[in-house]
Amino acid sequence: HTDHSFVEKVLECYTKARNTEDLAELCDASSIVTFRRTFLRLFNCPVAQWLRQKRAEQVLKLLRTTHLPLQEIAEQCGFANQSYLSDFCKRNLGDTPVNIRRNKIEMKQ
């Protein structure tokens, strides 16, 4: 793998990965240790942190730009159910999905 093809493969596969192991497998990595090391070198952060950030960006985008039901957003972002989405938002974004969406709507007015 060249560095460029590694990055391309990660960007192509990350939306289907729930964790580091999933992403390594989707990227056809022969070793999880080597995958983590290469990822850290090229992305300048651990895999799990990067995946969490990407998921947070996706959640925010859907909450702020769509009127999709929260269950649909949960499914699109890889959460088992709406409760996991809510927990993720509270932990990583500082508020509930409903409040994040409401605050965005209020800011537009």
Regions found by a protein language model. Give the residues of each.
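Inter-domain helical "communication" segments and dimerization helices
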Residues: 1-19, 26-31, 102-109
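Basic, amphipathic alpha-helical hairpins
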Residues: 4-19, 39, 43, 60-69, ...
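Terminal helix-turn-helix DNA-binding modules in bacterial transcription factors
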Residues: 21, 41-80, 102-109
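Append "Primarily bacterial transcriptional regulators
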Residues: 22-30, 35, 39, 73-80, ...
